[in-house]
Structure formats: C-alpha cells, structure tokens
Amino acid sequence: MFSIYSMYFIFLILFVDKINVNGLDPSDIVIVILDQKEGYHMAHAEMLKKNILEQAEALDKDPPKIILSHKLNINGSWTIIPLLNYLLDTYSTSKWFFFCLENTVIRLNKLLSILLKYKENKNIWIGHVLYDQEPTIIHHFAEHKKKLKYPHIASGFGITSNLLANLVHKINEGDRPKDDFSIDASYEFASFVLKVGKGVRLTHVSEICIISNSECATYPRFFHPCGSSVTTENIYFAVKTCSKFHIERIPVIKRTWAKYATNIGYFSDIADKHLPDSFIVPNTTQGHCAKTYSILVQADKILKKKNLNWLIISDDDTIFSVARLLRLLTCYNPNTPVAIGERYGFQLWDSDYGYEYLTGGAGVALSASLVHEIIELGKCECPSSTTPDDMFLFGICLSRIRVQPVHSSMFHQARPSDYATAYLASQEPISFHKFWMIEPQTVYDEWFAEADKSLITVRKHTEL
C-alpha cells in the first residue's frame, strides 16, 4: 500500500513539475499589433488590446505584453524587420512574439494552447500559410524550387524567442534586406527568414484561420462600414489616361464601375469628342508627376466649386467597386488631411531617407482638405515632369506636409491572379489593376458587379 501511494505521489510531483516547466502563461507572450496612427485604425488597435487584457483577466492570469506599433515611431515598422531589435532588447525574457493587425480577432486561451505545442527554444514560426500559384509581379516574379510559404498577417503569426534572437543576430551582422522596394511585407519577411534562418520555413497551423469557425484561435475580422453618409455625389473620380488608350480602355471603364460615378473626369493629352467630360493635361511616357500634379490642381477647383469631400485618382486600367469604396470612406473624416490606398515602401532600411507611399495603380483616395493643402502650401511641385508621380506626390510630398498615408489591404496594385486565393478570401477587395492578360469585364463581373448593384437601388430612391 505504501509503495503504491509513494509511486502515485512521485508521479504527481513530476506531473505538476512538468506543467510548471512547459506551461505557457499569457505574460510569456508579446503581442505586436501592426497598426496605424490614423484615428480609425488606432481605435481598432486599442479595442483589440482591451479585449486581450479582458481575456487574460478572465483567465486570472497576468496579461501579455501588448505593443501598438505606431507608438514606437520606428520607420517601416509595418515591414516587421525594423521592429526586431527593439523587441529583443525590451522583451528578452519572453517566449513568443505574436504579430497581427488591428482587425485580427484573438482567442487568447486557444492561442496559448497552440503555442504550447511548440518549443520556444527552437527556430520555429507558425501561421496560416499562403503561397503563390505562379510567379507574380508583386513578388518580383520570384521563382523558387520549393514554393515559398508566407503568413497571412491579418490572421497573425508567431515567432519563438529563439528564432527572433537568431534573426536579430543576423541583422546586426549586416545581413538585413537591402531591396529598394517593400511591396508585400509578409512575403518579404518570409524570404528573409528563409535566407538567414538556415532554411526555416513557416509552419501551417489550421487554427490560425482565414475565415472564422469555432476552432479558430485567430482570424481576420471582415470590414464593416462606420456609417452610411458617403454617396457618389460626395466624390470626384479623376481618371488618368492618354489618347493611346481612349478606344482600348475607356469604354471598359464606362461599362463597368464608371457608370456609378456621379462626378467623373478623364485627364488626357488631347481632346476627344467621345470624352466630353475630359481635361487636357501634359503627358509623359514615364513618371507622370507633372500630369498627376495638373490633375490635382484642376481637381482642387472642382472640389471647391461643387463642395465635394473626396478625390479618387485612378489609372485607366484600374477596376473598382464603387459601392465598397463608399463604405470604406465612411470611416474617415474628409475635413482632415487623409490619403488612403495601398502602401509601398522605398528604401525603408534607410532610416534617414526611406519613405512609404501609396501606389497609384491601385487607386488613391484623397480628402478634399488634403488636396487643398497639397496645392496651396506649395511644397509639392514636381522635381521634374517624369518623376514617379505616386512616389513623390503620395509619398515624399505627404511627408513634407506631415501626413502619413493610410494603408488599406482592400486596394490592389495587381490583378486577382497575382494574389494568393486564401488572401483574397479574407476580405472584400475594392480595386484591382492592370488589363494585362485578363478580360477586365470578367474581373469586374466576378469581383465587383454584385456589390455595385446596391448603388442602382440607392440611385432609384434618390431620383424618387
């Protein structure tokens, strides 16, 4: 009897000890919310932080360390790599680092259960795996013998303290990325980890989800509008074109999204009787800075005359859902300087000269007050007519007038086929770009036509 009791007691001690050694508390984790300074995004980041703290309290545990990246003022923090040194220096005793966005939903207890399955002293990172079906422009047409796995950031991904320390060691040895352009932070970070982490590949975890279900530890929350006050009557669409594409592209735009635009102008190099709502602006074969600046000057007058709130600048091969664009704009104040689109970076590894900008092909939404500032302050005249317009006007110029561009993942610089299927499944896209090797009418019909039908009903009610 004594021996049986003794064996049971020893087993119990060993079992409890094992739990204590291998257990993972919320306080062992650092959660990094890759957020933005703009009010709407910052508010959602604060709500996520509050929710995580409440979950930790419900578990009767000390909470995770939670970082809102915008508060660190680290240049290019959205590309992740610039944050790593700070994280290791500040939270050297933490076991896991979990990165997410402000629209990520986190079920803390389930996340802890997942992380507990892996050893933090190993080079491991976990997430929801995405991969390219074929080489794509947004990933520099890179080809890999084995498909590169990269995480869906909106679902979140975790990195062990050991892997993070090894990455920082490589960075400090000078082995940091020196690519000029940052386009897709997730893909580029995965490439970096694979290169300097001795072949460490992302581990797929099904509970880190794209679409919510009861088993999910995390998943991205779909966008919800903040009101219903923005209508097509509040917006002016400026389409950049040239005579070369009047016949090939403009009819496509008019058949698809432009038929829902109450106020629209086509900015071209020559007059065209088939484009009565057109304006003549200087054209160049590259860069287009003078052309886009001329559009801003003309649009500023139109916005003032018609008392409009928003300017949308579009290429002549950009495809929109006007209805989804209107819903997005309900979350921003047009009386403050706001620029919204898809964010790219240029030489972000250079803390003195690197900057971010909104890429023009995806479409750019500018508040009327921002357009007025760009023109009236006189700080944004193009260095040359062929300077890249988006990099200068929606990057350097915004920096000069102290306006940070707002990134929305629903704007897309490329075609649907250039993105991972699961990535697009987690959102409702607003735009795609390029009429190259696609049928643009089909793209519009498949992605946007159904959403835009709601505008037909709205217009009928308005006319009544």
Language model regions located:
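Secretory-pathway lumenal glyco-enzymes, predominantly type II signal-anchor Golgi glycosyltransferases
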Residues: 2-464
